[in-house]
Each structure stands twice: as structure tokens, then as C-alpha cells.
Amino acid sequence: MIIDFAYAANTGAAVIPVDGLVPLPNDQVKAKDITVSPDSTKFTVKTGGIYQVGYVVNTDKALTAGARLLVNGEPKEGAAVGGIAALSLSRLSNEVLLRLSDNDEISLQIFNNPIGTALLPAPVGASLRIVRLS
């Protein structure tokens, strides 16, 4: 059963610095208990529980960079994809179940990008979905 949910996207081209957080300022569906930082890079869950979190990152060309979820600024095990020097990808996606505590903060990060930037092409360069299940 879905208790609460939030969604946000980046629908314009954006330049993301090395190990930068992905801004998600567009098409926001705001949840009752999930708040968004002013720069649209951090999503805070007010109530702890089990959350299903999914993301998609599209780049304009294949990169060796990866994407991952951070919880309170720390990489969450099992929530990363890509980031392997021998593997170039232009679409990175993942979906995980996370046990979160009150006021935990979720961010989407691009990491291990030797070029220093990842260009996210329109119409949807990246999206993040957060669903509270319990």
C-alpha cells in the first residue's frame, strides 16, 4: 500500500560537476511528508519507514560515470549503477527499497566521471521517485 509519494525530474539540459548532485527542479509532485531543498537536489523524508526509491539518468553520450543514491550525504549500498571504467553507459537506472529514519535526506549523485560533467539532454535528463510503503 502506498502511503505517500514524491516525483521530480530535470527536463532541461544541465551540466553536472564531478561527483555533483543532480538538480530535479521540474515536474515535481510534492508529498505531504517529503520536502525538497531550494536547489532541488535534496529530498527529506519527515517520517521514517520503508521507501521504494527509483531513479533514471540520461546523458547525451556514453560515459564511464555512475549514478547513485546518497542518504544523509553517504552512498547507499546497492543503490548505485555504472561507474566502471571499462563500461560506458548513457542511461543509468536503479530501484531499491530503503529503510529510512525520520528526517533522512535523499540525493541523486553522478560519480566517477572523468570528464567532469554529464550533460542531461531534454526532455527528461533525470528523474527520481520516492514512495513510502510503510
Task: Give the location of each predicted region.
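Extracellular jelly-roll beta-sandwich "head" domains, especially the C-terminal globular C1q domain
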Residues: 1-134
